[in-house]
UniProtKB/Swiss-Prot annotation:
Residues carrying N6-succinyllysine: K198
Keywords: Mitochondrion, Ribonucleoprotein, Ribosomal protein, Transit peptide
Subcellular location: Mitochondrion
Targeting signal (transit peptide) range: 1-27
One cellular-component annotation, GO: mitochondrial ribosome
Native source organism of the sequence: Mus musculus (Mouse)
Record has Zinc-finger as a keyword: no
This protein's name: Large ribosomal subunit protein mL48
Assembly, per entry: Component of the mitochondrial ribosome large subunit (39S) which comprises a 16S rRNA and about 50 distinct proteins. Interacts with OXA1L.
Keyword Magnesium on entry: no
Family: Belongs to the mitochondrion-specific ribosomal protein mL48 family.
Domain of life per record: Eukaryota
Amino acid sequence: MSGTLGKVLGVWTNTVSKQGFSLLRFRSLGENPIFSAGGILWTSRHYKTKPTHGIGRYRHLVKVQEPKKKKAKVELRAINVGTDYEYGVLNIHLTAYDMSLAESYAQYVHRLCNRLSIKVEESYAMPTKTMEVMRLPDQGNKMVLDSVLTTHERVVQISGLSATFAEIFLEVLQSNLPEGVRLSVREHTEEDFKGRFKARPELEELLAKLN
């Protein structure tokens, strides 16, 4: 019995000494005993203070938003008068009571100009105009409000239209003009540029007082 116990203890001591030797060899070579073949399980952690450090980070996935740039103030540019064979800057005015109708036809005119190689300077909306329709009742002399008409206007500004092609271009616009939209083409002037902006009489009075 004592001989058998001595053999078991001797085998166990030999195994422990071999494992200790292999551990020392791994440490001297800089290897990790967990990932090395034949090594014993190493229970120590590589991190001790922040086990969840870096988990759940998302800021590197979100794109950095650029600061919004302020819109540049629209300034009056030099008006191109044109030549004997070519028109200067022309404004195509589209007026309608239905805003969606005026907007869709303005987009059609813009695409048509691009397809026909007519330079489009810009396309913009004019201030909405409101008109009240008054009605005189059968009895009484006081006018009564009958309806309110809202007029929407879009402008497509073009340049470089040749005089020979202008007639054909206007015929195409007239043939595709939807019902309820009024079309007018005229040369661009300084008054047209000022008409783009809404009048602010109170602000103008305050600026006049400050100056």
